[in-house]
């Protein structure tokens, strides 16, 4: 079992444990390299969503070296990446955070030619949208911060190059979670979050850069405000959004403001909250308790997020080779299937499919009714036979992204105003 240091501070939570699918080790290394790599330890840190014990254990089994992991919340990840660049080798970081981190020079651009499945990465990351017909979403799109011009680049390129800031690994489309047995009526819009009918039974997440995006989706849904770019608000737009939230708070609309996966699960499972900002695996966690919970598709579309693996600037030699091998292994299918089974999406769907049953693939990716019970990576029943994934297929869900999690130009001002809302 690989040594692992996991400090839990929330951020999309973990459904840890190894899946039943086996994976062949990547081979073809020189013998000396294969022997030496056993002595390598790579230190990875990032958000809890993909800092998984099962991945560290599988790395040891398949690649032979040791991967240690530390899980932090989003803000702590960004701070550590910039202020403690020698304390990690691999950063598992979200794309909207890389907008802050990469220009500081603490990470090195990655050579796309060394990534075996680079040409199979979902076009959201390599072309900016899912299909040629898809609309460009607002916010910090992964494509806009995904490339730099060269091996020493710090400035984001306007388009695809051979040098990547992160290798994408995980992403999803977020919406509202509801208790269909308690809301008492159909839910179809973001504005339903602030319907007075749910006074004292609603919740919004207290991560400023994400919570304010949910608030913006609500305000546009109501028709109160039309943003030029929800992901890059002006000061007047921030002021109006926060004033709206404070008014709703003072009216008693919100039961709580959650920061962690477990908090969101407990609020919904207890019935204290019946409509809230939520993450897909948290909905699944509520359902696993036998409690009705739905990840509700909404007319205005989804708010999306994505993360990837980046390499620290100081990494070189055998450790750098090991990092590239790890990233190639990550995209080779086993991890992708594991993440897909949690309700996320993998960056290379083609390889993940090889590690999923036709029924799993049909349910999670194609939006088909489950032919048999759908199991989580640890073997628990997540959905009963006949169930259909909320929101449908991969194309239906990721094709309806309205905005991406973002870092605004007025980020500091936004956080200051958000804190005023929480304190109000």
Locate predicted features.
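Extracytoplasmic/periplasmic substrate-binding proteins
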Residues: 253-316, 353-356, 360
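Conserved C-terminal helix/tail region of periplasmic/extracytoplasmic solute-binding proteins
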Residues: 378-424
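N-terminal secretory signal peptides
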Residues: 1-9, 22-23
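Early extracytoplasmic/lumenal segment of secretory-pathway proteins
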Residues: 35-104
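Extracytoplasmic ligand-binding site segments that recognize negatively charged/polar headgroups
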Residues: 50, 102-263
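Alpha-to-beta junction loops
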Residues: 84-92, 106-108, 198-200, 270-275
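Mature extracytoplasmic/periplasmic domains
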Residues: 34, 312-389
């Amino acid at each position: 079992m690989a040594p692992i240091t996991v400090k839990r501070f929330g951020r999309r939570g973990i459904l840890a444990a190894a899946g039943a699918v086996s994976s062949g080790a990547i081979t073809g290394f020189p013998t000396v390299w294969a022997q030496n790599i056993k002595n390598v330890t790579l230190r990875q840190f990032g958000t809890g969503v993909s800092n998984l014990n099962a991945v560290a254990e599988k790395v040891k089994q398949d690649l032979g070296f040791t991967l240690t992991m530390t899980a932090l919340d989003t803000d702590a990840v960004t701070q550590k990446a910039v202020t403690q660049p020698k304390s990690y080798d691999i950063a598992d970081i979200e794309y909207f955070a890389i907008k802050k981190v990469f220009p500081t020079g603490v990470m090195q651009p990655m050579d796309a030619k060394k990534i075996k499945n680079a040409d199979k990465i979902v076009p959201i990351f390599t072309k900016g949208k899912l299909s040629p017909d898809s609309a460009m979403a607002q916010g910090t799109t992964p494509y806009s911060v995904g490339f730099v011009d060269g091996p020493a680049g710090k400035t984001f390129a306007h388009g695809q190059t051979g040098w990547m800031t992160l290798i994408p690994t995980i992403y999803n489309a977020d919406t509202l979670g509801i208790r269909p047995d308690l809301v008492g009526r159909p839910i179809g819009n973001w504005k339903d979050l602030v319907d007075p009918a749910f006074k004292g039974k609603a919740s919004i997440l207290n991560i400023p850069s994400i919570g304010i995006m949910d608030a913006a989706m609500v305000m546009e849904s109501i028709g109160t405000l039309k943003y030029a770019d929800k992901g890059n608000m002006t000061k007047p737009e921030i002021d109006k959004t926060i004033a709206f939230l404070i008014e709703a708070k003072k009216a008693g609309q919100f039961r709580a403001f959650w920061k962690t996966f477990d908090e969101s699960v407990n609020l919904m499972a207890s019935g204290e909250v019946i409509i809230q900002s939520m993450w897909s695996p948290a909905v699944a966690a509520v359902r696993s308790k036998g409690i009705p919970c739905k990840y509700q598709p909404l007319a205005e579309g989804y708010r999306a997020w994505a993360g990837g693996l980046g390499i620290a600037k100081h990494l070189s030699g055998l450790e750098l080779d090991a990092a590239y091998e790890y990233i190639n292994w990550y995209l080779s299918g086993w991890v992708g299937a594991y993440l897909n089974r949690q309700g996320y999406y993998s960056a290379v769907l083609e390889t993940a499919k090889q590690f999923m049953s036709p029924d799993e693939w049909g349910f999670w990716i194609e939006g088909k009714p489950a032919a048999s019970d759908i199991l989580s990576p640890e073997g628990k029943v997540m959905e009963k036979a006949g169930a259909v994934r909320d929101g449908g297929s991969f194309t239906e869900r990721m094709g309806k992204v309205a905005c991406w999690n973002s870092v605004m130009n007025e980020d500091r001002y936004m956080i200051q105003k958000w804190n005023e809302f929480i304190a109000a």
